[in-house]
């Protein structure tokens, strides 16, 4: 898998992702080793205690008002399609839902239930752009299904012709 073709929150494509900013994050799987007095050189049993997780981090660099509102909450100023500003939220905001990441290599990662944590960051200079620094906290879906999966992209026009034929359910 390689290359980000599109990132969506629900049905909304959230804009350009800064080159080199995507990191899967998360944690490695955890286990407990069981040792025996009679076996000094290795554990006699390893018990898995937690699966590996992902917690992607990335930076959005296409800062139109709709993208800002999509990941930070708050209020858009103006009329639909002709927004003239954005106001920060006045109350605690939790934005959760389905995320999809289409890869250039021909796969799509679907996260049915993730909470976005984001802030305005970066630098305000003529050589860099401001950005929305984002982290997805992947949560268990309410229906008990997998927290994320990776499959061949349904709309192959978004991916390159080098897509892999097999899908991976995680």
Place the predicted regions along the sequence by residue.
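Beta-strand secondary-structure signal
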Residues: 55-59, 98-100, 133-137
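Solvent-exposed edge beta-strands and adjacent loop segments
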Residues: 1-68, 115-131
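Short, flexible beta-strand-to-coil junctions
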Residues: 61-63, 102-106, 141
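Mixed-charge, glycine-accented linear interaction segment located at domain edges/termini
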Residues: 108-170
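Basic, gly/Ser/Thr/Pro-rich low-complexity segments located predominantly at protein N termini
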Residues: 25, 30-31, 78-79, 90, ...
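Charged, amphipathic alpha-helical segments
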Residues: 63-88
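Acidic-leaning, charged glycine-interspersed low-complexity segments
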Residues: 82-122
């Amino acid at each position: 898998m390689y290359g980000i073709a599109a990132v969506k929150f629900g049905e909304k494509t959230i804009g350009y992702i800064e080159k080199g900013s995507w990191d899967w994050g998360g944690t490695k799987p955890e286990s407990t080793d069981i040792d025996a007095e009679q076996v000094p050189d290795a554990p006699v049993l390893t018990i898995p205690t937690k699966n590996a997780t992902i917690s992607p981090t990335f930076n959005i660099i296409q800062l139109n008002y709709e993208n800002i509102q999509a990941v930070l909450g708050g209020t858009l100023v103006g009329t639909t399609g002709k927004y003239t500003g954005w106001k920060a939220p006045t109350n605690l905001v939790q934005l959760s839902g389905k995320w999809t990441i289409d890869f250039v290599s021909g796969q799509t990662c679907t996260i049915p239930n993730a909470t976005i944590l984001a802030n305005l960051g970066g630098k305000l200079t003529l050589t860099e752009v401001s950005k929305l620094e984002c982290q997805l906290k992947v949560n268990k879906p309410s229906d008990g299904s997998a927290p994320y999966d990776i499959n061949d992209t349904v709309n192959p026009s978004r991916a390159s012709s080098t897509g892999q034929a097999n899908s991976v359910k995680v």
